[in-house]
A protein has these predicted regions:
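Active-site helix/loop of acyl-thioester processing domains in fatty-acid/polyketide metabolism
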Residues: 39-62
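Short connector loops at helix/strand junctions that flank enzyme active sites
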Residues: 4-6, 16, 36, 48, ...
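Short, small-residue-rich loop/turn micro-motifs
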Residues: 23-27, 116
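HotDog/MaoC-like acyl-thioester-processing domains
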Residues: 57-59, 76-78, 82-133
Length: 133
């Protein structure tokens, strides 16, 4: 996952029912005020959520994010961010994943809910490798 590598995202654990990933605070991922940029946080959540969706795909299927909603609760000014993704719905045409983001002290800083399309092997996905990570 080249974009995830660019951001320094490290997938710590990946299973069908839970994916855990982490991203370190870095000045290059911040706004001018030293706060981690919301787009970086959303990219962390999208990465963990997409991995969760891929692990729940039927054999030969691919996926692409078709909807994502983020609620931000706190700013991150240091440390790292942990992402914990769980599938809320695994269906024939969509997979819905909820990803909670936590700061280094364990406080929830954001919650992301995303919907992933389940694409047949003949479909065109937005994820590199035909929707498989």
């Amino acid at each position: 996952m080249p974009f995830a590598e660019l951001l320094g995202i490290d997938v710590k654990n990946a299973a069908r029912d839970e994916v855990r990933a982490q991203m370190a605070w870095s000045e290059r991922l911040c706004t001018t005020a030293g706060v981690m940029h919301g787009g970086a946080l959303m990219a962390l959540a999208d990465t963990a959520g997409a991995v969760c969706a891929v692990l729940n795909l039927p054999e030969g299927a691919a996926t692409s994010t078709i909807e994502s909603k983020t609620n931000f609760f706190r700013a991150v000014r240091e440390g790292h961010v942990d992402a914990v993704a769980h599938p809320l719905h695994v269906g024939r045409t969509t997979i819905v994943v909820q990803t909670d983001l936590y700061d280094a002290t364990g406080r929830r800083i954001a919650q992301v809910t995303q919907t992933q399309a389940v694409l047949s092997s003949g479909g065109s996905g937005g994820t590199a490798g035909g929707g498989r990570l």
